[in-house]
């Protein structure tokens, strides 16, 4: 699924059964980079934002509350999807 399509799906509130790899691709599309992995925690940072994004993969999916946290962060800092 394209980044734009996934973002539209999430914005409509469809937060269940989101593939971890697809969501990581979306997070990276907003300019975040993987800083480190500690166990199941994947920590992403953005060069212009001090707050970090913590994602956990559970059975190949991302936790819905972490999707909500990320969407709030994008809105708070008015970050735009890069490229595609």
Task: Enumerate the language-model features and the residues they cover.
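A short, structured beta-strand/loop element
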Residues: 28-56
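Terminal, regulation- and interaction-focused segments at domain boundaries
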Residues: 2-18
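Short, electropositive, low-hydrophobicity segments enriched in small/polar residues
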Residues: 17, 43, 64
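Polyanion-binding surface elements
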Residues: 13-31
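C-terminal structural segments of small proteins and small subunits
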Residues: 58-84
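Glycine-/small-residue-rich active-site loops that bind phosphorylated ligands and cofactors
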Residues: 15, 50, 61-62
């Amino acid at each position: 699924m394209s980044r734009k399509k996934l973002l539209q799906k999430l914005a409509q509130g469809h937060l269940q059964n989101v593939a971890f790899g697809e969501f990581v691709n979306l997070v990276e599309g907003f300019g975040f980079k993987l800083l480190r992995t500690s166990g199941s925690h994947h920590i992403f940072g953005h060069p212009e934002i001090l707050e970090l994004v913590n994602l956990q993969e559970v059975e190949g999916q991302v936790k819905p509350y972490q999707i909500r946290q990320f969407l709030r962060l994008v809105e708070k800092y008015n970050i735009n999807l890069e490229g595609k």
